[in-house]
Amino acid sequence: MEKRHFMATHTWVSDEARDQLLAATSGMSDKDFFASLKTENAETLAHWMGQGDFFFCHWYATDANAIFESLEASGMNDLIVTMPSEMQRYISCEKTSGQILINPFNADPSTDG
């Protein structure tokens, strides 16, 4: 199955869960972080976390269930609540092509650029 882009909104199940996960990852490098979440069907491409209740990840996965399977395998799924949302339009200033933007509401995306 082909992988697709997802944005996931995450939050902690509790303050204790937040403290537990942050302690467990305190000595982890960025490479270790991405490797710990990579499976055959899902991988994290980017991660944003501030001091608020929510944090965000860009996932490349076959489906939303593959994201939950990756989180379960890493031991994180019991510590966070996750809402993955598939994004039909994914563009990045780091990789531009000049193609017409995909309209995610188009019933036939093959007619988009």
Where are these regions (language model features)?
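An amphipathic, aromatic/His-enriched active-site/gating alpha helix that lines ligand/cofactor pockets
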Residues: 36-37, 60-93
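Well-ordered beta-strand positions
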Residues: 48-49, 60
